[in-house]
Amino acid sequence: MSLNFLDFEQPIAELEAQIEELKSVGNRGQLDLNLEEEVQRLTTKSQELTEKIFSDLGAWQVAQLARHPLRPYTLDYIRMIFTEFDEMAGDRSFANDEAIVGGIARLDGTPVMVIGQQKGRETKEKIRRNFGMPKPEGYRKALRLMQTAERFKMPIVTFIDTPGAYPGIGAEERGQSEAIARNLKVMARLTVPIVCTVIGEGGSGGALAIGVGDRVNMLQYSTYSVISPEGCASILWKSASKAPLAAEAMGVTAERSKELGLVDSVIPEPLGGAHRHQEEMAVRLKRQLIADLGSLQGLSHEELLDQRYRKLMSFGYC
């Protein structure tokens, strides 16, 4: 499977291409040479180079990884982490927005409501999922699922991965801002545990609408910001080409969000990013979700709401 190497990974890509070429020659038996030693040498060199590059990534490089086309999406994690997933559709008012997926599932045997934004892989799916940008009906579907979880006393797990809420005219006419605001209000008052994880892009209000939780996590190479680096650059410098500078200035990385107290945990990704070792990433994420829910399950409704309120009110203060 092609790893779709990013620009800053090109030295790694060149080594991997050499390795694949040598393996291909060896498999065809065209040369009476022992290629195993050379393949091993190049593999070791590729590993060392990957470690070196990924030990010093800038904010813009992290932003590129957060958008990687092979990065696991919500439905991938649902498949790898949960069992007995039963998807629920529609907002019971207008339509079913497929940019938001959710339903009842089991996490290590415990019934939970899992909700997340879903991007697409191929062109048709990207269009069907609206490139992971939910409309009001998507957020109202998420709200309906969260209220169902409240009714049946199920913990809520959300996966955040969106460039932002859809800014189209129709979405605005149907109350995009109201839908986001209502979700924030309701999530702050739910009496069941809520664990949120940014798995890719955490874009502005579109991310916050399913991001109010008792525990908020970020994967190591995910981002969280009020606007995309390109959008910020277009406003401040009148050119999207300044996106790398904007990414650094905004502090979009998980490490920076943790320093600011905006998230509780940064979940390490396998070397090279979650897309290279999806199953391993799922194991790490599952472990964190189970630990978070375990720490919250023993709290009373009053304790849960008090902790959540204090957490929200601490934002913006030293």
UniProtKB/Swiss-Prot annotation:
GO terms for biological process: fatty acid biosynthetic process; malonyl-CoA biosynthetic process. Pathway: Lipid metabolism; malonyl-CoA biosynthesis; malonyl-CoA from acetyl-CoA: step 1/1. The keyword Nucleotide-binding applies. GO terms for cellular component: acetyl-CoA carboxylase complex. Its main location: cytoplasm. Its EC number is 2.1.3.15. It is found in: Cytoplasm. It holds the Pfam family ACCA. The keyword Signal does not apply. GO terms for molecular function: acetyl-CoA carboxylase activity; ATP binding; carboxyl- or carbamoyltransferase activity. Keywords: ATP-binding, Cytoplasm, Fatty acid biosynthesis, Fatty acid metabolism, Lipid biosynthesis, Lipid metabolism, Nucleotide-binding, Transferase. Residues 41-295 form the CoA carboxyltransferase C-terminal domain. It comes from the Bacteria. It catalyses: N(6)-carboxybiotinyl-L-lysyl-[protein] + acetyl-CoA = N(6)-biotinyl-L-lysyl-[protein] + malonyl-CoA. Acetyl-CoA carboxylase is a heterohexamer composed of biotin carboxyl carrier protein (AccB), biotin carboxylase (AccC) and two subunits each of ACCase subunit alpha (AccA) and ACCase subunit beta (AccD). Component of the acetyl coenzyme A carboxylase (ACC) complex. First, biotin carboxylase catalyzes the carboxylation of biotin on its carrier protein (BCCP) and then the CO(2) group is transferred by the carboxyltransferase to acetyl-CoA to form malonyl-CoA. Belongs to the AccA family. HAMAP family: AcetylCoA_CT_alpha (MF_00823). This is Acetyl-coenzyme A carboxylase carboxyl transferase subunit alpha.
